[in-house]
């Protein structure tokens, strides 16, 4: 049964145990009530999620039924906090047989004014995918195993040889404003792409994206997060012809790890996107997730890349650092590629300046900082 802010009574003996419990609960409370302090999510009135939720709108969940009930419950004027414990299998152990079945059972819609926070390093969502389509959402300290579509579709027009494509991303931010994604780990997890076999002469791809921001989404910060073992990672802007995106898709990603990511780290259309102090690790010859490119510069994008570090074997120039997908505005400052300073700027001016305060680390400090602090369980 779902219980708002319910804690199981414990028979405590000894002042030390009581003290430790008090400290733990205090730290946990601070995590759940934090608001965004960096990047684009601080603008437009800020991102508060459910930080001011009333006690009866704070839920602790440990299975799919409780999670879905907490998301569906009335949040009140100050929203809700959902504290996620352990591994939640959204399928309840019943494998999805069709894409339509997955759409019905795996989708997790996040209401506005919601904070979702993992209570420990073991907090993880499997066999499900989040949709944030309402404003003011915070997700922190959580691992999301990227969803596995049981029915990939063959598209003979995708690329020179055709490709298999699938539905559903680990998290989709669609049309929502003010979203903060912090210390979240996205990974293919138990189902890496080398397990899928081939058909029509091409790898059969059961994954789509890890994190997509699209359809007029705005004021989004991704901080100290991890993207690991995935092909098409982070899309910002889903179409060259989406006019609702004009003037929107303002996104910051900082101090995050991209490890064995083939592409889209991120791939941007239209948006004013600030990428700083991120660490990319990989290889162009990786057997499962070879690096094709790091950042994709798409139509109308205005990317400011700053003091990022790319340790990707096989990269020697800018074509795989900032790949041309129809864009023309790209500025880089102080980034390192395999230990060397490299200037990959296409433009001296990008037409905008970050309106928020921030202090980027020197590039030679980035790898250690990201290793120590990024991802679920390091908050």
From Swiss-Prot:
Molecular function GO labels: metal ion binding; pectate lyase activity
Coiled coil spans: none
CC per GO annotation: extracellular region
Record's signal peptide: 1-29
Alphabetically ordered keywords of this record: Calcium, Lyase, Metal-binding, Secreted, Signal
InterPro entries, A to Z: Pec_lyase, Pectin_lyas_fold, Pectin_lyase_fold/virulence, PEL
Residues reported in the UniProt entry to bind Ca(2+): 169, 208, 212
Positions of the UniProt region annotated as Disordered: 190-209
Cofactor(s) listed in the protein's UniProt record: Ca(2+)
Active-site residues per Swiss-Prot or TrEMBL entry: 264
Enzyme class, broadest EC rank: lyase
Pathway linked to the protein: Glycan metabolism; pectin degradation; 2-dehydro-3-deoxy-D-gluconate from pectin: step 2/5
Cofactor binding note of this UniProt entry: Binds 1 Ca(2+) ion per subunit.
The reaction(s) this protein catalyses: Eliminative cleavage of (1->4)-alpha-D-galacturonan to give oligosaccharides with 4-deoxy-alpha-D-galact-4-enuronosyl groups at their non-reducing ends
The protein's name in its UniProt record: Pectate lyase
